[in-house]
Amino acid sequence: MRTYSCLQLVIWTCIFHMVDNSTLQGKDSSHFLRRIVNLKKDEGKMLHRAKRGWMWNQFFLLEEYTGTDTQYVGKLHTDQDKGDGNLKYILTGDGAGNLFVIDENTGDIHAAKRLDREEKSLYILRAKAIDRKTGRQVEPESEFIIKIHDINDNEPKFTKDLYTASVPEMSGVGTSVIQVTATDADDANYGNSAKVVYSILQGQPYFSVDPESGIIKTALPDMSRENKEQYQVVIQAKDMGGQMGGLSGTTTVNITLTDVNNNPPRFPQSTYQFNSLESAPLGTHLGRIKANDPDMGENAELEYSIAEGEGSDMFDVITDKDTQEGIITVKQNLDFEKKMLYTLRVDASNTHPDPRFLHLGPFKDSAMVKISVEDVDEPPVFSKLSYLMEVDEDVKEGSIIGQVTAYDPDAMNNIIKYSVDRHTDMDRVFSIHSENGSIFTLKPLDRESSPWHNITITATEINNPKQSSQIPVFIRILDINDHAPEFATYYETFVCENAKSGQLIQTISVMDKDDPPRGHKFFFEPVPEFPLNPNFTIVDNKDNTAGIVTRKDGYSRNKMNTYLLPVLIFDNDYPIQSSTGTLTIRVCACDNLGNMQSCNAEALMLAAGLSTGALIAILLCVVILLTLIVLFAALKRQRKKEPLIISKDDVRDNIVTYNDEGGGEEDTQAFDIGTLRNPEAREDSKLRRDVMPETIFQIRRTVPLWENIDVQDFIHRRLKENDSDPSAPPYDSLATYAYEGNDSVANSLSSLESLTADCNQDYDYLSDWGPRFKKLAEMYGGNDSD
């Protein structure tokens, strides 16, 4: 309370000083207001000062009041107040009524709640003095401020609860690592409540912190990551300038030492031992070596190499980037018989050295690698990787064309035998001497059919047939002039009837299957048997071609329509080869430009006296004749259909049988006499007699006319088929006829009616029914004696 009273005294002293410097103007003292502030209400002592109008600017109040009573702020008063209770004081503005309350009679202001400067540090309010009787303001409304003074009630807080930082290892003292920051919500302009000081609680003696800036620095030189990589530092921030009683906050900083290349690689052992078969292929991995480097990442990347000296040309080392190992591989073919042991020096060095630490020594290490070569039974080795041989195509069978040589590289030097791989010489053109490797021919050679022969020779150890090797042999067949030149193509040559002497009618060229090294050279001459041809001559163009030239004016197709011209062709190689080719020259009719129009075919027709119109007429007659022959043949195949009634007396094709007891009037069946004459025509259409037949449309076909048909035999055969038909009803079945059809146009001919009628009936009326019933009238008509 002593501090609080002193603070109020200082504030009001400043206010009174301001009042003393003011000049009072005006004569009416009734317009002066008096503001009375009670500095200490309990003491009962009051300081007052008179001034015209309202004379306050601001009040001050400490935050976080913890008393039980309301906190007194100040008093409002005007000289118009006579103390008789006629004036009423009203307070409006920020917090009026809930935070700040006023005694409307006395003008005393109190804080009803505890205030927090960090929430709101300034309140603006307005004061009024009103006459209770008239309700009018005795003074104009005035504005004043209540400022909240700060107390140290907030501790410093860091922006992060946990910081993460890194610093390179081997850093010097004072190397900056990271800066931490703490803030205090108290008023930095009032006292030391917001003045923060940093200190280190954990992490010494490795790190330190600047008390004002919060920058963490290294405190020890040359800290090694390999010894310790992670550090945890605790930093404290305290207000009140770090004095006793100040509030504080802490944070944690995790610091990692990052790697630098300050360690050279080191082999864990000085000597390595590996073995290799002498037959190991190139690139075979013999073993791995590794140098250790405690650094990390690219600082630990290594490069292996073989130092110049023994074995550097026989072996190689490859760096495995994933495992940082050196892989020893075979670089050249090994030979146990030549060298059995190799000693190599392998170096391992850093690929990214740090110049700052080169003074520590060379960043590489060396180790010795010994490689022992083991003996194996090796296959024969040829003296060459491949052989090329040449031979003339006219050599005799059995001629030697070359030799291959192979040897056993082993110390035992086994005997070698040679053979030809027949898969490469299917025609068995060549063979080889099994002991000395001489290759010779088995068949005649022909360069034109096979200019090259590629065979494979196999060399095999006699004592160990599994040990063998092969080599390709390329045999080129050299050309011999053994083919005569001949025409390059077939020439269709003609000469116009109106040709002039000396006219070129054909240029010929030739071909030769041989291939002389100096190229072809051909010559053309007439054959010796006909050195001088009166019709044509051969002109050698000296460029491997020749021209056929006429020797007279005009040619006649009627006299000679074809000429044969033999040509002698020979080359200039050794031995000289020649051949004779014959040109067939036709005589043709040509236009003025020399284009062929017609040749000897028209000449023959004209000689026979046939014109073009006659030829067309002959062809037309031939076509008509062929058409007539085809029509006649077609008509012959048509067979004449036999008429249903041969004569008017033949009425057999409608004879009706009445001995079928199931028959009625219109359901009786009559035999078709045409069918009886051609029974096979109905074989495929069998109708059941116990059902009503359906209407069947059959294709009408022509049947051959058979004059001699055994109708009786046909009827018996058909009867037998019906008797054996399983679908026909049994003979003793009862047939019921509910409808027997319409009346016949004739009187009833039923057998039932005939039995019941008088035996003496007159059948003469049958003669009136026409020729179809003539036979029936003859059978039943006439006298009884008949």
From Swiss-Prot:
Q: Which residues form the signal peptide?
A: 1-21
> Where's it found, cell-wise?
Cell membrane
Q: Main subcellular localization, coarse class? A: membrane
Which intervals hold domain Cadherin? 54-158, 159-267, 268-382, 383-487, 487-604
Membrane topology qualifier? Single-pass type I membrane protein
TM spans (from-to): 615-635
Phosphoserine is found on: S785
Q: Does the keyword Lipoprotein apply?
A: no
Keywords linked to the UniProt accession: Calcium, Cell adhesion, Cell membrane, Cleavage on pair of basic residues, Glycoprotein, Membrane, Metal-binding, Phosphoprotein, Repeat, Signal, Transmembrane, Transmembrane helix
Glycosylation positions in this chain? N21, N254, N454, N535
Q: Which residues lie on this side of the membrane: Cytoplasmic?
A: 636-786
This entry carries the following GO cellular component terms, namely: axon; dendrite; glutamatergic synapse; hippocampal mossy fiber to CA3 synapse; postsynaptic membrane; presynaptic membrane; synapse
Concerning Pfam families, the annotation shows: CADH_Y-type_LIR (PF01049), Cadherin (PF00028)
Segments on the Extracellular face: 22-614
Annotated Gene3D superfamilies: Cadherins, TCF3-CBD (Catenin binding domain)
Matching entries from PROSITE patterns are given as: CADHERIN_1, CADHERIN_2
Chain positions listed as propeptide in the UniProt record: 22-52
Which is a GO BP term held by this UniProt record?
A: homophilic cell adhesion via plasma membrane adhesion molecules
Q: Which InterPro entries match?
A: Cadherin, Cadherin-like_dom, Cadherin-like_sf, Cadherin_CS, Cadherin_Y-type_LIR, Catenin-bd_sf
Job description of the protein = Cadherins are calcium-dependent cell adhesion proteins. They preferentially interact with themselves in a homophilic manner in connecting cells; cadherins may thus contribute to the sorting of heterogeneous cell types.
- Provide the protein name: Cadherin-9
- What is the native source organism of this protein? Mus musculus
Q: Which gene encodes it?
A: Cdh9
